[in-house]
Design a protein with these regions (language model features):
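Polytopic transmembrane helical bundles with strong interfacial aromatic enrichment
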Residues: 2-159
């Protein structure tokens, strides 16, 4: 089982080591993002038509604006972390981690872009659906990356 994975570390140090803690950090951010998103869904009434130019005036007029902004900023942090993981895995030179990291980044983008479209596009249910699909795929690909990199680290330490 582990024998086929030895090519990860053959001839060079294992550069995927920072991916493991970053993957755990990203997973914790995704869980926190889910909790904030559920709070917004259940307890905050977002005005039906929000234009980007009107957003700053909403900070005074509606109670949940701070939560919405925090949710958006956390989403941007998640996107930056997943982009960093993609760059690290690319420079690692190991194709499977690069493919998983790319899938993770694209799923984060799917969720984030549809979140923005949901907020600024009249709260269309299809955007909410694709936002949730992006979130679920992000969790799946992040866990796959964590497991894959962890197996590679175990091989490196057992050599």
């Amino acid at each position: 089982m582990v024998k086929g994975m030895t090519h990860v570390t053959k001839g060079r140090s294992f550069l995927g080591a920072p991916l493991f803690p970053l993957g755990l950090f990203e997973l914790s951010l995704l869980v926190f993002q889910f909790l904030i998103g559920m709070y917004l869904n259940l307890f905050v009434n977002i005005p039906a038509a929000i234009s980007f130019s009107r957003m700053m005036s909403l900070s005074v007029s509606y109670d949940g604006f701070g939560f919405v902004m925090f949710h958006m900023m956390l989403g941007m942090l998640i996107a930056f972390v997943s982009l960093g993981m993609l760059v690290m895995s690319f420079f690692n030179g190991h194709s499977p981690t690069t493919v998983i990291s790319l899938a993770l980044f694209l799923s984060v983008l799917l969720g984030g872009i549809n979140g923005l479209l949901f907020l600024f596009g009249g709260q269309n249910n299809i955007n909410s659906y694709f936002m949730s699909i992006g979130f679920i795929l992000s969790i799946i690909f992040d866990m796959l990356l964590i497991m894959f990199v962890n197996v590679g680290q175990d091989i490196h330490h057992n050599r």
